[in-house]
């Protein structure tokens, strides 16, 4: 079935219009020179003529003196050297002399021979032993050269100025092209086309956007019943989940032009440039309809008006936002121009931008679950030779919390490791080594003392042992005392499945296991070190959220005390105002301390009771440096881990 929409001749785009009326454009490339431009040139030349003698006086550093003063100093044998050029004499005194009208004594001078001449001057100079230099009179060529030196820069600057004006008039974008849109246009060709098959792990988001694709392919299907497609679709989600890729897939599936621009590219230092770029972008899109406009990082221009405390760029950003609001609500939706935008800060967007008629549909792109991660890995390993025995579902299960960008990086790192090792395919070892490198950091060749190695071994053994003994704690997959990243040792714990709810018992187990390293140091050595800094940061964050967000403190009660609207996909905003009293803040601090102290006491108690297991695990770490989960269980005597019932 032939679609009438596709048979309609497309309006000429920028490429086809570029070579129209070529001869005419070449003949009138400079265009008419405005009358004010000639006034500017005349004023510039006059200023140059008046200022040049002041900036570049003849005889640099010389003072003009009367001829009689020169003759007097010559008689006093105070003239050291002179240079003559026609009737002009420049020279230098042996000793500086006081000249009427000049505050400072004069050493270099300039004077002129009277019109009636002085026949005795040369003999007097020779008699006094004055060094005489002669310069020829200026020729016609040197005069022209002097004129070019004086007026040439001004003329060149004026010609450059006229060229800029002509370019600005021909492009109709203002001087220097500041108002021109910087949107990049992508035409869906077979070599660069992105489809929904290239996007995996976010099936719900793809289903939401399938209607947009259907509208671009079959607009009459909706228009015949009076329906209109949403003018704006806002993609919301954490960084790396595939929002930009999803937008390009929509354009690839629909087979229409795709204009992409970052929100930060609209705003410039000059007020009004952002609004001009918005207008130009939408004008260009209307000529290419049906098409898609994609604005990445919308929060750069879409922040709530009046909420910024910054002075610089504040008015410019608001003008750009106002123009965007007008354009989205000012053009006919039946023209087939759809605006997609992506952000991970939906809480800061202006309400007028989210109202029906603008960005009235919101698609949340969440982190993929285990099945989604498996599909993403299958997409990214299409062109990667894999070990036939490799099970990608095992890799997907070991990567909870990773998004599409992380998994793509994981596949690339695994392929690089396999190539470095001279393999012909990528196997399980390469994937897990790459995962450790990404999550834990690269191994460092760091020489540490035996005492520090022993402390690190007990510190990591405390983490690992409590991770095995505590109920609901995340499984321990690996422990090492090889320095990685900024840590001297690492205990790698990840949940077996994706978690969406946390019990209080689970959270306390996480705090207790995180404090196991500090507790082991105090128990074995009697002193503590700075090695638990990151552990203390983690447990403080968990305990405070238990008190302020999740209602797990009886004294504080069932209240939510974090500032409203200050958390998003990037985490809490540090610039917030506290919305509770000082007395309640004291209670929150006390309850946070209480939870941490109770968990630390439990960690000390468990490690003291299991001291033999702790010593065995630490000694094994000192020998092997790295232990996997099965080795840890055998050393502490817990036996092989039993699989969970299906």
Swiss-Prot record:
Similarity field: In the central section; belongs to the AAA ATPase family. In the C-terminal section; belongs to the peptidase M41 family.
Biological role: Acts as a processive, ATP-dependent zinc metallopeptidase for both cytoplasmic and membrane proteins. Plays a role in the quality control of integral membrane proteins.
Composition-biased stretches (Basic and acidic residues): 7-26
Annotated residues for binding of Zn(2+): 459, 463, 535
Species of origin: Thermobaculum terrenum (strain ATCC BAA-798 / CCMEE 7001 / YNP1)
Quaternary structure (record): Homohexamer.
CC cofactor: Zn(2+)
Keyword Transmembrane recorded: yes
InterPro entries the record matches: AAA+_ATPase, AAA_lid_3, ATPase_AAA_core, ATPase_AAA_CS, FtsH, P-loop_NTPase, Pept_M41_FtsH_extracell, Peptidase_M41
Binding residue positions for ATP: 237-244
Gene symbol of the encoding locus: ftsH
Cofactor details (free text): Binds 1 zinc ion per subunit.
Subcellular location: Cell membrane
Name under which the protein is recorded: ATP-dependent zinc metalloprotease FtsH
CDD domains: RecA-like_FtsH
Source taxon at top rank: Bacteria
Residues annotated as catalytic: 460
GO cellular component, one term: plasma membrane
């Amino acid at each position: 079935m032939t679609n009438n929409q596709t048979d309609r001749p497309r309006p000429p785009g920028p490429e086809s219009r570029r070579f129209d009326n070529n001869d005419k454009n070449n003949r009138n490339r400079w265009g008419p020179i405005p009358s004010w431009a000639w006034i500017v040139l005349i004023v510039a030349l006059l200023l140059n003529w008046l200022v040049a003698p002041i900036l570049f006086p003849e005889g640099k550093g010389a003072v003009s003196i009367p001829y009689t003063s020169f003759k007097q100093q010559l008689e006093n044998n105070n003239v050291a050297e002179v240079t003559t050029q026609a009737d002009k004499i420049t020279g230098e005194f042996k000793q500086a002399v006081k000249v009427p009208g000049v505050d400072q004594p004069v050493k270099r001078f300039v004077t002129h021979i009277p019109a009636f001449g002085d026949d005795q001057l040369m003999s007097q100079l020779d008699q006094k032993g004055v060094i005489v230099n002669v310069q020829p009179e200026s020729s016609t060529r040197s005069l022209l050269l002097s004129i070019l030196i004086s007026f040439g820069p001004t003329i060149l600057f004026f010609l450059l100025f006229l060229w800029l004006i002509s370019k600005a008039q021909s492009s109709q974008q203002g001087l220097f092209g500041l108002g021109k849109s910087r949107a990049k246009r992508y035409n869906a060709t077979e070599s660069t086309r992105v489809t929904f098959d290239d996007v995996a792990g976010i099936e719900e988001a793809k289903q939401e956007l399938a209607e947009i694709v259907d509208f671009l392919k079959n607009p009459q299907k909706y228009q015949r019943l009076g329906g209109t497609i949403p003018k704006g679709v806002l993609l919301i989600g954490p960084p790396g989940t595939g929002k930009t890729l999803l937008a390009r897939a929509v354009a690839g599936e629909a087979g229409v032009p795709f204009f992409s621009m970052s929100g930060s590219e609209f705003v410039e230092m000059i007020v009004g440039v952002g609004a001009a770029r918005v207008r130009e972008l939408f004008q260009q899109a209307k000529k290419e309809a049906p098409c898609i406009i994609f604005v990445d990082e919308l929060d750069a221009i879409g922040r709530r008006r009046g909420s910024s405390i910054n002075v610089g760029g504040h008015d410019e950003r608001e003008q750009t936002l106002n123009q965007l609001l007008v354009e989205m609500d000012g053009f006919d939706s039946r023209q087939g121009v759809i605006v997609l935008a992506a952000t991970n800060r939906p809480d800061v967007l202006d309400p007028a931008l989210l109202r029906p008629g603008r960005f009235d549909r919101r698609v949340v792109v969440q982190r993929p679950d285990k099945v989604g991660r498996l599909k993403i890995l299958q997409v990214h390993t299409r062109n990667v030779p894999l070990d036939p025995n490799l099970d990608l579902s095992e890799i997907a299960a070991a990567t909870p919390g990773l998004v599409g960008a992380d998994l793509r990086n994981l596949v690339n790192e695994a392929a690089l490791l396999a190539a470095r090792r001279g393999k012909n395919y990528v196997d399980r070892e390469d994937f897990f080594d790459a995962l450790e490198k990404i999550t834990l950091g690269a191994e460092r060749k760091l020489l540490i003392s035996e005492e520090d190695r022993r402390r690190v071994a007990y510190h990591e053994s405390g983490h690992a042992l409590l991770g095995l003994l505590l109920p609901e704690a995340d499984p321990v997959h690996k422990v090492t005392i090889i320095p990685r990243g900024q840590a001297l040792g690492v205990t790698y714990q990840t949940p077996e499945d994706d978690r969406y709810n946390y019990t209080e018992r689970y959270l306390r187990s996480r705090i207790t296991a995180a404090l196991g390293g500090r507790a082991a140091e105090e128990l074995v050595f009697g002193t503590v070190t700075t090695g638990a800094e990151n552990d203390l940061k983690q447990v403080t964050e968990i305990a405070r959220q238990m008190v302020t967000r999740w209602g797990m403190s009886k004294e504080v009660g069932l209240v939510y005390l974090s500032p409203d609207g200050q958390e998003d996909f990037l985490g809490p905003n540090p610039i917030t105002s506290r919305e509770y009293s000082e007395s309640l803040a004291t209670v929150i601090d006390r309850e946070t301390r209480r939870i941490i102290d109770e968990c630390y006491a439990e960690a000390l108690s468990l490690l003291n009771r299991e001291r033999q297991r702790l010593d065995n695990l630490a000694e094994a770490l000192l020998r092997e440096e790295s232990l996997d989960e099965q080795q840890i269980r055998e050393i502490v005597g817990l036996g092989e881990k039993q699989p969970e019932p299906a």
